[in-house]
Curated annotation (Swiss-Prot):
Family affiliation: Belongs to the methylglyoxal synthase family.
Gene: mgsA
Organism whose genome encodes this protein: Thermotoga maritima (strain ATCC 43589 / DSM 3109 / JCM 10099 / NBRC 100826 / MSB8)
General function of this protein: Catalyzes the formation of methylglyoxal from dihydroxyacetone phosphate.
A GO molecular function held by the record: methylglyoxal synthase activity
KW Transmembrane (keyword) present: no
Protein name, UniProt field: Methylglyoxal synthase
Signal peptide (from-to): none
Keyword Lyase (UniProt): yes
SMART domains xrefs: MGS
Keywords: Lyase
Length: 155
């Protein structure tokens, strides 16, 4: 990861105010990085704080999946996602998929304000970082070979 990180900012409706406050508090640090956000969250950050944000679709309309695709393509380095654990979301499966893809590609993820505070204040946030990446492609190839050779059934 370069010194300038590409940070995705997402918040469920009941957590948007929290994210807005957090971003406002960390404006100095965040302004040094490239910011991405899902639709409504991005609009709020632009309107209320005057931030330059690359806006994607709203979460329920595919924005979470767009962020996930960007993670898989190596175009997002950090995910800050203030989600609402008490409110069921129409796109809960997208949220789970997003967290899973962030884990597969080993990017830092904060889903609570405390974790976001620790993450943003890390010296690594403003420095070059060489992340360790598990090669899941190799594991997939191994599983495919076993299925083809009849050693185990596909799951």
């Amino acid at each position: 990861m370069d010194k300038k990180k590409r940070i995705a900012l997402i918040a469920h409706d009941r957590r948007k105010r929290d994210l807005l406050e957090w971003v406002s508090f960390n404006l100095g640090t965040l302004s040094k990085h490239e910011l991405y956000a899902t639709g409504t969250t991005g609009a709020l950050l632009q309107e209320k704080l005057g931030l330059k944000v690359h806006r994607l679709k709203s979460g329920p309309l595919g924005g979470d999946q767009q962020i996930g695709a960007m993670i898989a393509e190596g175009k997002i380095d950090v995910l800050i996602f203030f989600w609402d654990p008490l409110e069921p979301q129409a796109h809960d499966v997208d949220v789970k998929a997003l967290i899973r893809i962030a884990t597969v590609y080993n990017i830092p993820v904060a889903i609570t304000r405390s974790t976001a505070d620790f993450l943003i204040s890390s010296p690594l946030m403003n420095d070059v970082y060489e992340k360790i990446q598990i090669d899941y492609e190799e594991e997939l190839e191994r599983r495919i070979r076993k299925v083809v050779e009849g050693e185990e059934e596909e799951t």
